[in-house]
Amino acid sequence: QLHFSGAMLSSVGLANEIAGFRSEVSTRDIIATYPYPNTLVVCEITGKQLKTVMERSAEYFAYDKDGNVCVSDSFLIPKVEHYNYDYYMGVDFKINPENPIGSRIEGLSKDGKPALDDDKFTICLNNYRYSGAGGYDVYTECPLVKEINVEMVELIMDYFHEYPYIEV
């Protein structure tokens, strides 16, 4: 997403079940891994708003009866919603599941500098999440910078054409 958008940050959620890629990737593999017809948007987000959406993702974690980190019931009941946990690129942070909900993101920084409430960033995410879906209402308050009206599957294929050998 960063490659195609030029944004400072990126946020992505993955499907509940992912087929994954083999050593040689086909178009079918890409479609199976990213089955949604989403496109990308870039919006402007403040440090405070960024922390708020990251706190929503941090709600994903809980502790089981033995004290082990697990997935929170709120992401499992009444239906499994792993796709509502978002991954973030372009910032450093720590999630501390021992803290109460709303106070779990620690050490949020960009390029080694603390992300302050009034700081402004550009973030790339899919159009579904930008609509506020999944409990991410804050995105609806973020000004749109640009839309990339190409479906994700096509962008992923373009990336593989440009970079045919990728190490993971």
Indicate where each model-derived feature is located.
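Feature captures C-terminal
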Residues: 2-168
